[in-house]
Amino acid sequence: MAAKDVKFGNDARVKMLRGVNVLADAVKVTLGPKGRNVVLDKSFGAPTITKDGVSVAREIELEDKFENMGAQMVKEVASKANDAAGDGTTTATVLAQAIITEGLKAVAAGMNPMDLKRGIDKAVIAAVEELKTLSVPCSDSKAIAQVGTISANSDETVGKLIAEAMDKVGKEGVITVEDGTGLEDELDVVEGMQFDRGYLSPYFINKPETGAVELESPFILLADKKISNIREMLPVLEAVAKAGKPLLIIAEDVEGEALATLVVNTMRGIVKVAAVKAPGFGDRRKAMLQDIATLTGGTVISEEIGMELEKATLEDMGQAKRVIINKDTTTIIDGVGEEAAIQGRVGQIRKQIEEATSDYDREKLQERVAKLAGGVAVIKVGAATEVEMKEKKARVDDALHATRAAVEEGVVAGGGVALIRVASKLSELRGQNEDQNVGIKVALRAMEAPLRQIVLNCGEEPSVVANTVKAGDGNYGYNAATEEYGNMIDMGILDPTKVTRSALQYAASVAGLMITTECMITDVPKGDGPDLXAXGMGG
């Protein structure tokens, strides 16, 4: 076993803080409407230019093992905020850095780290409840466009596009982002259906750059059974190979020799196949297979109605213009099913919604209607160069996540104002002892950090602006884009409540653990061993 390097107490914490600061300082230059870009070197191709906090955080690896541990823990904050709400990664990093810096000062001054952490946790729980009371529902198109605009770094066209896409496919509809061909952004609404089942084997992937399987004009085999014996499949595979089209298999499961044979056929290029599990379970799976059959003009091969897989023909297959499968979703675009049949099916499900007794059933039925009737909206991002395209696409993705979060949990005043209002409302909060009170103060002081950083990135004086905003009340704040004070909601500067909440919770979670660190252990770097003298042969 390799020798270990161990650091204790202040030595460990100083190193850890240095790593935290390197990562956070790189990320926080991107915050706010006047945040700057960061250029990331790539081992191949052009460098990537980004203003997305999590993309910057993911690039950072430090040479010093102890500093790197600090950086990696804060990277986790950005990643978690990104997974939960899809945005707010820079805010989360700024909050984490502020809590860690203030917290470690308190530890150095002799406070008990565990009580500090309890105080921080108490403040965050109270702050989350307070955020919920400040939250305003986000339902109209104008508010959705404003949230999208702020999240796309004040790009109004992106905000409007997302609001338009949500109008067309509904708030439950599926919206995807693709590379455009021109200079302008476009919005395409494609009839389609998406369900959460990915490919059964990564060997089906034919677009390695996106990690997806794309099938053009495939046949779609729908089977309400497990397929493990390849002999059942042979007639279908031969017919599809003759037709020269790809095949998508949607079945209860495809396993064993059947899956292995499909993979081998695909890799050898004999027939292009992909297999996914059918969505849902039990009766809901049968119903969803029937939905897909209606959409694609196919028939579900089910032994319950006396159909056997060996006897299936191309007439029983569904068809679609295009199918995209990634590791956890499958999207069927432009199924060839008849409009009348689709509308009939939608009517049938709506009737079931009226008769449904439980909220859960009603919700699942509404999801099915959205998938059958809503379609898929595709935002095509236009740009002059590939570098700009990548940067813009990342921003549109962020904005899309933010608007979904806003529709889900509502919005609060943006520009760091909501956290300042929460902190002032919690100024009377107390813990069980003095050290916990210091922990509460650390968390409340850290809640000013996002506003201060936004102002700093504008080249203004953070303390002056922070004090002016604190002196106001309600949604009164500082518009960093125009450098004016006013009502943030009226000025259209909104943050999704979910994004602000997630940023605060994840920042406090990781920062609290780092404050309570007393010892760090890592491998001793392997030095070059001493050169062995060459053994002479004598004489």
From Swiss-Prot:
Cellular location(s): Cytoplasm
Q: Do you know which InterPro entries this protein is assigned to?
A: Chaperonin_Cpn60_CS, Cpn60/GroEL, Cpn60/GroEL/TCP-1, GroEL-like_apical_dom_sf, GROEL-like_equatorial_sf, TCP-1-like_intermed_sf
Enzyme class, one word? isomerase
Q: Does the keyword Isomerase apply?
A: yes
Name the positions where ATP binds: 30-33, 51, 87-91, 415, 479-481, 495
Q: Which reaction equation describes what this protein catalyses? A: ATP + H2O + a folded polypeptide = ADP + phosphate + an unfolded polypeptide
Q: Which GO terms describe its biological process?
A: protein refolding
| GO cellular-component term (any) | cytoplasm
Q: Which CDD domains match?
A: GroEL (cd03344)
Is this entry keyworded ATP-binding? yes
- Name the predominant localization: cytoplasm
Q: What Gene3D superfamilies is this protein classified in? A: GroEL (3.50.7.10), GroEL-like equatorial domain (1.10.560.10), TCP-1-like chaperonin intermediate domain (3.30.260.10)
Recite the UniProt keywords alphabetically.
ATP-binding, Chaperone, Cytoplasm, Isomerase, Nucleotide-binding
Q: Extract the coiled-coil ranges from the record.
A: none
GO molecular function terms noted in the UniProt entry: ATP binding; ATP-dependent protein folding chaperone; isomerase activity
Query: What this chain does, per the record?
Result: Together with its co-chaperonin GroES, plays an essential role in assisting protein folding. The GroEL-GroES system forms a nano-cage that allows encapsulation of the non-native substrate proteins and provides a physical environment optimized to promote and accelerate protein folding.
Record's family? Belongs to the chaperonin (HSP60) family.
Subunit comment:
Forms a cylinder of 14 subunits composed of two heptameric rings stacked back-to-back. Interacts with the co-chaperonin GroES.
What's the protein name? Chaperonin GroEL
User: Its encoding gene is what?
Assistant: groEL
